[in-house]
Amino acid sequence: MQPPSEHVHWLFATGFLLLGLCLLGEALVGPEVWRRRAWRAYLWPGLAFALGIFLWPVMTFYTNSAIHMLAHGAWAQLLMIAGAAELGLVRGKLQSQWWRLAMTAAFLVSGTALLVHEQNAWFFQRSSFLHHLMGWTLVVAALFPFARAVKPLSKVAATGFALTFVVASVMLYSDRDVAPVFGHLSPLAGAPHR
């Protein structure tokens, strides 16, 4: 028996929240203080890479259409690439700060995939609303990882980047399969689960 998709979303929301809190901690104290313990430098890039790995089983076992499978596959690949690029930068294997643009690409492609694979209108049901909201949030928030690549020491870019993951986790925690959004539920969506 498969768990409802909202349970899987909540698990990834927890991962995104941890990722955002690690990034927020680094943004608040600065990279010099954050990296006094060597393992902390690897924490958020490793978590991003691990979330990408965990998206593969979701793509394989929890999707019910080709467009969902492609979207989850794109998210898995880009999270792994962005996490690997950040790990390479931390380790010193990659020298150019332009590798940080991998996360910009991850945000843009993920946001676009969220918008493309949701076929219903904004107020059809809560999951439709959250797909649109999260998609546009990631597309607009792609400015933060881009700013991190251009100005690596920018506090605004680092804080905005961290808060993007926190906001995304809140959106994922709000997910329900069939639930009203702002009191509105399309009659075509079906009966709400709770």
Where do the model's predicted regions map?
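Hydrophobic transmembrane alpha-helical segments in integral membrane proteins
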Residues: 1-16
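Membrane-interface helix caps and helix-loop-helix hairpins in membrane proteins
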Residues: 3, 61-67, 91-94, 118-126
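Hydrophobic cores of alpha-helical transmembrane segments in multi-pass inner/ER membrane proteins
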Residues: 12-24, 74-89, 133-148
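Juxtamembrane "helix-exit" motif on the non-cytosolic side of transmembrane helices
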Residues: 54-63, 114-123, 174-178
